[in-house]
Amino acid sequence: MADQRQRSLSTSGESLYHVLGLDKNATTDDIKKCYRKLALKYHPDKNPDNPEASEKFKEINNAHGILADSTKRNIYDKYGSLGLYVAEQFGEENVNTYFVLSSWWAKALFMFCGLITGCYCCCCLCCCCNCCCGKCKPRPPEGEDQDIYVSPEDLEAQMQSDERDTEGPVLVQPASATETTQLTSDSHASYHTDGFN
């Protein structure tokens, strides 16, 4: 068994039709009739001493399961057993995407874009490093101040002067709530300061 060569995946999509003895443009009813006829002929209960009949029955069941399902049949007709394998791995809705992305022109486009961007380094620099280390950085609109560099010492001095300008800390705390405290008061609280009434 270990020496046996693994079966390669076909892309023609014809071998399942040959298992049932049909051609590619067979209808669903034709598939059903041929399946029933062959399933009765090779059923393991009718051939208990024949292991080849059991294997043939498994192949017939597999072929019927794929060809009776319209989605799987379309994938098989278009891409063969390789398409069924891809559908099993990535989902039936992603089969077309897989084959488009694995086509020669998609690979060539990917390699061309990688080549002209220096292995996609420029794409990373544009997103992460503000366009080629700032050389191609978009200019701010007229009238807006440009970002200027502020040294840490100047920033610290500004923070200290802001702290000196403010008054002392707020020392008055709100009254603590007790069981007799009303949850809603009749008077409306005002959040205005004296200068903005």
Curated annotation (Swiss-Prot):
J domain boundaries: 13-82
GO cellular component: chromaffin granule membrane; cytosol; intracellular membrane-bounded organelle; melanosome; membrane; plasma membrane; presynapse
Bilayer topology: Lipid-anchor
Cross-referenced InterPro entries: DnaJ_C_subfamily_member5, DnaJ_domain, J_dom_sf
Modification comment: Palmitoylated. Palmitoylation occurs probably in the cysteine-rich domain and regulates DNAJC5 stable membrane attachment.
Biased composition annotated in UniProt, kind: Polar residues: 175-197
Pfam family, one: DnaJ
Keywords recorded for this protein, A-Z: Cell membrane, Chaperone, Cytoplasm, Cytoplasmic vesicle, Lipoprotein, Membrane, Palmitate
GO BP terms, alphabetized: chaperone-mediated protein folding; regulation of synaptic vesicle cycle
Localization per Swiss-Prot or TrEMBL: Cytoplasm, Cytosol; Membrane; Cytoplasmic vesicle, Secretory vesicle, Chromaffin granule membrane; Melanosome
CDD domains per record: DnaJ (cd06257)
Region (Disordered): 153-197
Known role: May have an important role in presynaptic function. May be involved in calcium-dependent neurotransmitter release at nerve endings.
Name of the protein this chain belongs to: DnaJ homolog subfamily C member 5
Organism of derivation: Xenopus laevis (African clawed frog)
